[in-house]
């Protein structure tokens, strides 16, 4: 899980979602998981 000031999609399967007021990237590849904060 990466914590970045700006989250971006890395591959085609990455999805940007809002969960509990935080922007997240979820993906099949665990290395692509990100959260904005």
Curated annotation (Swiss-Prot):
This is Large ribosomal subunit protein bL36A. It comes from Clavibacter michiganensis subsp. michiganensis (strain NCPPB 382). InterPro entries: Ribosomal_bL36, Ribosomal_bL36_sp. Keywords: Ribonucleoprotein, Ribosomal protein. Belongs to the bacterial ribosomal protein bL36 family. SUPFAM superfamilies: Ribosomal protein L36 (SSF57840). The gene is rpmJ1. One of its GO terms (molecular function) is structural constituent of ribosome. One of its GO terms (cellular component) is ribosome. GO terms for biological process: translation.
